[in-house]
């Protein structure tokens, strides 16, 4: 991790908090920008080219903003990142930003992996149980891994709760090998 990514993330989190912007709105706008960024190779090429003048990069950002409708705070943050030639680390900066905001809001990031896609009712039920385990609000990312065979694996920080069929088989195999 680049140390500057954490600094940019903390500074942006400070600005978002001072502006009293809803985190969901800010995150959605950043996601929209990143979707545009990831979908346009020519845009990435220009924004990553240090020989391209920063003023022109910001002008391009402002034209993009006419379609994206970014909050001034979000637009200004992206302009600073562009002016300081840090776009190459944007994914890392945004990851750090999300983690910083979660820390400030007392939200625990969790990863939930299931053997198949979970429907909305299953997700809601699982999130309630995971919230109890995490002792608070959670920001969950859901993943699928058919090799689990069934059940779920929940990761809260460095702690892993393995309720998968594959995990049960592995534990059974260990018990049988000991005997």
From Swiss-Prot:
One GO MF term attached to the UniProt entry: proton-transporting ATP synthase activity, rotational mechanism
Gene symbol of the encoding locus: atpH
Pfam families: OSCP
The protein's role, per its UniProt record: F(1)F(0) ATP synthase produces ATP from ADP in the presence of a proton or sodium gradient. F-type ATPases consist of two structural domains, F(1) containing the extramembraneous catalytic core and F(0) containing the membrane proton channel, linked together by a central stalk and a peripheral stalk. During catalysis, ATP synthesis in the catalytic domain of F(1) is coupled via a rotary mechanism of the central stalk subunits to proton translocation.
Name listed for the protein in its UniProt record: ATP synthase subunit delta
Subunit comment: F-type ATPases have 2 components, F(1) - the catalytic core - and F(0) - the membrane proton channel. F(1) has five subunits: alpha(3), beta(3), gamma(1), delta(1), epsilon(1). F(0) has three main subunits: a(1), b(2) and c(10-14). The alpha and beta chains form an alternating ring which encloses part of the gamma chain. F(1) is attached to F(0) by a central stalk formed by the gamma and epsilon chains, while a peripheral stalk is formed by the delta and b chains.
UniProt xrefs under PANTHER family: ATP SYNTHASE DELTA CHAIN
Main location: membrane
Keywords: ATP synthesis, Cell inner membrane, Cell membrane, CF(1), Hydrogen ion transport, Ion transport, Membrane, Transport
NCBIfam families (alphabetical): ATP_synt_delta
Compartment list: Cell inner membrane
Assigned protein family: Belongs to the ATPase delta chain family.
Topology class, membrane: Peripheral membrane protein
Organism expressing this protein natively: Acidobacterium capsulatum (strain ATCC 51196 / DSM 11244 / BCRC 80197 / JCM 7670 / NBRC 15755 / NCIMB 13165 / 161)
Keyword RNA-binding: no
GO CC list: plasma membrane; proton-transporting ATP synthase complex
């Amino acid at each position: 991790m680049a140390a500057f990514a954490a600094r940019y993330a903390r500074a942006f989190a400070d600005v978002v908090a001072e502006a009293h912007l809803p985190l969901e709105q800010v995150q959605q706008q950043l996601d929209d920008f990143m979707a545009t960024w990831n979908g346009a190779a020519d845009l990435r090429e220009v924004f990553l080219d240090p020989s391209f003048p920063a003023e022109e990069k910001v002008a391009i950002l402002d034209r993009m903003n006419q379609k994206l409708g970014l909050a001034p705070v979000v637009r200004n943050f992206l302009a600073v990142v562009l002016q300081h030639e840090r776009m190459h680390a944007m994914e890392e900066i945004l990851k750090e930003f999300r983690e910083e905001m979660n820390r400030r809001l007392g939200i625990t990031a969790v990863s939930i992996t299931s053997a198949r896609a979970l429907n909305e009712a299953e997700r809601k039920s699982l999130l309630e149980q995971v919230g109890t385990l995490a002792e608070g609000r959670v920001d969950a990312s859901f993943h699928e891994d058919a090799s689990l065979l069934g059940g779920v694996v929940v990761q809260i920080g460095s702690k892993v709760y393995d309720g998968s069929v594959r995990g049960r088989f592995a534990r059974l195999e260990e018990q049988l090998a000991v005997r």
